[in-house]
């Protein structure tokens, strides 16, 4: 009986994926792709232009931005690439 109960608990944890964390890209501009696990449920990609050209910043969450900065937020793994 204990074995059956333990099996049900393990199956429930695997099916619910309780340990799931979001994965977001976090490379800057044209750097090689890198990712990071995130506690937040979204990823972002900020884009703006300055004297260096187009700058791209990626990361976890969905931050507030100043006017003139384009922001794209999304909710799937590596969606901000």
Curated annotation (Swiss-Prot):
Residues 1-21 form the signal peptide. Pfam families: Toxin_cobra-type. One of its GO terms (cellular component) is extracellular region. Its main location: secreted. Keywords: Acetylcholine receptor inhibiting toxin, Disulfide bond, Ion channel impairing toxin, Neurotoxin, Postsynaptic neurotoxin, Secreted, Signal, Toxin. Expressed by the venom gland. Disulfide bonds join 24-43, 38-60, 62-73, 74-79. SUPFAM superfamilies: Snake toxin-like. Coiled coil: none annotated. GO terms for molecular function: acetylcholine receptor inhibitor activity; ion channel regulator activity; toxin activity. It comes from the Eukaryota. InterPro entries: Snake_3FTx, Snake_toxin-like_sf, Snake_toxin_con_site, Toxin_cobra-type. Gene3D superfamilies: CD59. It is found in: Secreted. Binds to muscle nicotinic acetylcholine receptor (nAChR) and inhibit acetylcholine from binding to the receptor, thereby impairing neuromuscular transmission. Belongs to the three-finger toxin family. Short-chain subfamily. Type I alpha-neurotoxin sub-subfamily. This is Short neurotoxin 2. It comes from Tropidechis carinatus. The lineage of its organism: Eukaryota, Metazoa, Chordata, Craniata, Vertebrata.
């Amino acid at each position: 009986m204990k074995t059956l109960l333990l099996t049900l608990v393990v199956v429930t944890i695997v099916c619910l994926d309780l340990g799931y964390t979001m994965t977001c890209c976090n490379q800057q501009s044209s750097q090689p792709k890198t990712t990071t696990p995130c506690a937040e449920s979204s990823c972002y990609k900020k884009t703006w232009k300055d004297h260096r050209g187009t700058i791209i910043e990626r990361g976890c969450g969905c931050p507030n931005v100043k006017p003139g900065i384009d922001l794209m937020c999304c909710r799937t793994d590596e969606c901000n690439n």
